[in-house]
């Protein structure tokens, strides 16, 4: 249970990082 929870949080954090990165690229192109 803890492992699954930890993995889920990690995945969410990574996704957030990717979204931030995409937003930054968009601003640059933008």
Curated annotation (Swiss-Prot):
The terms describing its cellular component in GO are: extracellular region
Q: Which UniProt keywords apply?
A: Calcium channel impairing toxin, Calcium-activated potassium channel impairing toxin, Disulfide bond, Ion channel impairing toxin, Potassium channel impairing toxin, Ryanodine-sensitive calcium-release channel impairing toxin, Secreted, Toxin, Voltage-gated potassium channel impairing toxin
Q: Which GO terms describe its molecular function?
A: calcium channel regulator activity; potassium channel regulator activity; toxin activity
User: What is this protein's tissue specificity according to the annotation?
Assistant: Expressed by the venom gland.
Location relative to the cell: Secreted
Q: List the disulfide bonds.
A: none
> PTM per UniProt?
Contains 8 disulfide bonds.
Disulfide bond among keywords: yes
Q: What is its main location?
A: secreted
Q: Which domain of life is it from?
A: Eukaryota
Q: Does the keyword Secreted apply?
A: yes
In which family does this protein belong, per the annotation? Belongs to the CRISP family.
Please give the function described in this protein's UniProt entry: Inhibits calcium-activated potassium channels (KCa), voltage-gated potassium channel (Kv), and the calcium release channel/ryanodine receptor (RyR).
Q: What is the name listed in the Swiss-Prot or TrEMBL entry for this protein?
A: Cysteine-rich venom protein hematin
């Amino acid at each position: 249970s803890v492992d699954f929870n930890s993995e889920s949080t990690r995945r969410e954090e990574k996704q957030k990082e990717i979204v931030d990165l995409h937003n930054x690229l968009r601003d640059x192109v933008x």
